[in-house]
């Protein structure tokens, strides 16, 4: 299959990135290799979208620091970048809205590009054309329009399984995410994503739009474990990018005090969805 026939894909990873780890970066590489390897897709970009402070997750440090760490982690990447839109929102934004924002942004950019494209004219002397000839000639001179890349949600199996947590997700949001965008789920050791998809009617219905990527090289790094090591004064070298480690140490970001941030506060999606369910 030629590149022109492949669907271009943008991988979007939403999350706390508290802090970003080497595992987060590996998710992008694993997903890119898998999608390109199908012969049906070409991954053209990866986007890291840190959640805003309004998410109210326990131990979540300010978005300002999390964004900077993500930018430091992707400093040398040629295709993965950090987007701040979600992190700058005053209210927590559902993942569906973040996906929609980035898809609309791509479509708007493509529209602007087409409008600004120069009009091609037939060189040489003007002559009279029949309507059929004129239409055919114009068609051959017009540049081929390129399809807008499709945004797909990149995640780990833990996010996939969180769909089953009561009031954490709206059922209609889950349906739209898997039906209109799609998931690329990288599985960790001990997760059975395929079984979870089988046990969910919604996920099973749209299983063709859910790509499960097996991580054959075991990597159990997590932000939670990184924060725990930091609280205990243990080394995190080789678990996060060097620049991220330096930034954490310079600003003394993670401690017992920071882990108590938002303690006792209900997570934003649980608070909102529970309230809406009662109305």
From Swiss-Prot:
Cofactor(s) listed: Zn(2+); Mg(2+)
This protein's record includes keyword Ribonucleoprotein: no
Region span, Disordered: 107-144
Motif Nuclear localization signal, chain ranges: 123-129
Pathway where it operates: Cofactor biosynthesis; NAD(+) biosynthesis; NAD(+) from nicotinamide D-ribonucleotide: step 1/1; Cofactor biosynthesis; NAD(+) biosynthesis; deamido-NAD(+) from nicotinate D-ribonucleotide: step 1/1
Enzyme nomenclature, EC number: 2.7.7.1, 2.7.7.18
Localization (cell): Nucleus
Binding site for NAD(+): 15-17, 23, 57, 92, 95, 156, 158, 168-169, 215, 219
GO cellular component assignments: chromatin; nuclear body; nucleoplasm; nucleus
Any GO BP: positive regulation of MAPK cascade
Positions bearing Phosphothreonine: 119
Quaternary structure (record): Homohexamer. Interacts with ADPRT/PARP1.
Stored NCBIfam families: nicotinate (nicotinamide) nucleotide adenylyltransferase (TIGR00482)
Pathological association: Leber congenital amaurosis 9: A severe dystrophy of the retina, typically becoming evident in the first years of life. Visual function is usually poor and often accompanied by nystagmus, sluggish or near-absent pupillary responses, photophobia, high hyperopia and keratoconus. Spondyloepiphyseal dysplasia, sensorineural hearing loss, impaired intellectual development, and Leber congenital amaurosis: An autosomal recessive disorder characterized by early-onset retinal degeneration, sensorineural hearing loss, short stature due to spondyloepiphyseal dysplasia, and motor and intellectual delay. Brain imaging shows abnormalities including delayed myelination, leukoencephalopathy, and cerebellar hypoplasia.
Function: Catalyzes the formation of NAD(+) from nicotinamide mononucleotide (NMN) and ATP. Can also use the deamidated form; nicotinic acid mononucleotide (NaMN) as substrate with the same efficiency. Can use triazofurin monophosphate (TrMP) as substrate. Also catalyzes the reverse reaction, i.e. the pyrophosphorolytic cleavage of NAD(+). For the pyrophosphorolytic activity, prefers NAD(+) and NaAD as substrates and degrades NADH, nicotinic acid adenine dinucleotide phosphate (NHD) and nicotinamide guanine dinucleotide (NGD) less effectively.
Protein name, per record: Nicotinamide/nicotinic acid mononucleotide adenylyltransferase 1
Organism whose genome encodes this protein: Homo sapiens
Organism placement in taxonomy: Eukaryota, Metazoa, Chordata, Craniata, Vertebrata
């Amino acid at each position: 299959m030629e590149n022109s026939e492949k669907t271009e894909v943008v991988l979007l990873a939403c999350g706390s990135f508290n802090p970003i780890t080497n595992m987060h970066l590996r998710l992008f590489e694993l997903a890119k290799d898998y999608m390109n390897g199908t012969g049906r897709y070409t991954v053209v970009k990866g986007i890291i979208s840190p959640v805003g402070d309004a998410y109210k997750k326990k131990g979540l440090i300010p978005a300002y620091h999390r964004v900077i760490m993500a930018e430091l982690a992707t400093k040398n990447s040629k295709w993965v970048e950090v987007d701040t839109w979600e992190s700058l929102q005053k209210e927590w934004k559902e993942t569906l809205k973040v996906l929609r924002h980035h898809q609309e942004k791509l479509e708007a950019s493509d529209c602007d590009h087409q409008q600004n494209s120069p009009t091609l004219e037939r060189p040489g002397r003007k002559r009279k054309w029949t309507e059929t000839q004129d239409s055919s000639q114009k068609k051959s001179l017009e540049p081929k329009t390129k399809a807008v890349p499709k945004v797909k949600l990149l995640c780990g199996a833990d996010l996939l399984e969180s769909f089953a947590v009561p009031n954490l997700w709206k059922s209609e949001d889950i349906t739209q995410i898997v039906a209109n965008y799609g998931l690329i789920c990288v599985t960790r050791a001990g997760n059975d994503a395929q079984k979870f998809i089988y046990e969910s009617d919604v996920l099973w219905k749209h299983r063709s739009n859910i790509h499960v990527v097996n991580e054959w090289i075991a990597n159990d790094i997590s932000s939670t474990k990184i924060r725990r090591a930091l609280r205990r004064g243990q080394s995190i070298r080789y678990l996060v990018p060097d620049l991220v480690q330096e930034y954490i140490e310079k600003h003394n970001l993670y401690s017992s005090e920071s882990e108590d941030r938002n303690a006792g506060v209900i997570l934003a999606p649980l608070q909102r969805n529970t309230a809406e369910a009662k109305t």
